[in-house]
């Protein structure tokens, strides 16, 4: 069995708060204590969206617990249970950004020969990975302390990722393949997105082609939308 994984260059993740409970045992005190001690602390779990409680946005679980006069364990349990009961698999009622990793581990995983460099997020996920992942890896994770050469980095972003998920003629530049191409200045490529402003455009990206159509020209969007749904082992 071939094993692979997707990795992005940040110490914080983003998802529904319910993802902290894989067994969905939200009222298990021991489980909640374990989460706060070993996965993410109450100070490191911040709501970036909440349809039921808009006033929770940009507050941590610790902040909300303090305002409610409850323990952090009680509050995490309550917030997660409420979110699960009132949300659905296709429509979460909230999203959090939570620190749960360290840079040395992130570098180790990025450098693993079988890992894909991916963003794992879109532009509206309130996490800088959506706009900053690839420029950040290019600018900060090259060399002996990172992933090595620029060529290896690009390979892990493109051909390796496409191969691992079964996409035909993607991630390569050759006759007959789909023309998904990025023209960038490696010396001046830099991510600008942050946790407080996650949609800032990166620097150093000149032009982008998707399926042979130019969608970014001299750093400006062309208005073209040639993207398509990609399916495993399909044209």
Please annotate each region the language model reported.
Residues 28, 107-114, 119-120, 133, ...:
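C-terminal cap of metal-dependent C-N hydrolases
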Residues 14-23, 128, 194-195, 219-221, ...:
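Short acidic, glycine/serine/threonine-rich loops at helix termini
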Residues 55, 128-132:
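Alpha-helix N-cap/helix-start motif at coil-to-helix transitions, marked by capping-box chemistry
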């Amino acid at each position: 069995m071939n094993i692979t994984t997707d990795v992005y260059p940040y110490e914080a993740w983003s998802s529904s708060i319910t993802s902290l409970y894989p067994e969905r045992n939200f009222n298990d005190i021991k489980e909640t204590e374990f989460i706060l001690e070993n996965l993410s602390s109450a100070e490191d779990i911040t709501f970036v969206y909440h349809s039921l409680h808009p006033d929770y946005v940009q507050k941590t679980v610790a902040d909300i617990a303090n305002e409610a006069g409850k323990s952090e364990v009680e509050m995490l349990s309550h917030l997660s249970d409420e979110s699960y009961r009132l949300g659905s698999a296709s429509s979460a009622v909230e999203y959090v950004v939570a620190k749960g990793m360290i840079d040395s581990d992130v570098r180790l995983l990025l450098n693993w020969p079988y890992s894909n460099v991916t963003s794992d997020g879109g532009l509206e996920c309130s996490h800088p990975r959506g706009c900053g992942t690839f420029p950040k890896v290019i600018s900060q994770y090259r060399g002996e302390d990172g992933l090595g050469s620029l060529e290896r980095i690009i390979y892990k972003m493109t051909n390796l990722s496409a191969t691992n998920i079964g996409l035909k003629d993607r991630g390569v530049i050759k006759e007959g393949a789909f023309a998904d191409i990025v023209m960038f200045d490696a010396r001046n490529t830099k991510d600008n997105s942050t946790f407080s402003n996650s949609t800032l455009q990166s620097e150093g990206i000149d032009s982008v082609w998707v399926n042979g159509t130019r969608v970014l020209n001299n750093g400006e969007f062309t208005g073209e939308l040639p993207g398509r749904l990609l399916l495993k082992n399909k044209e």
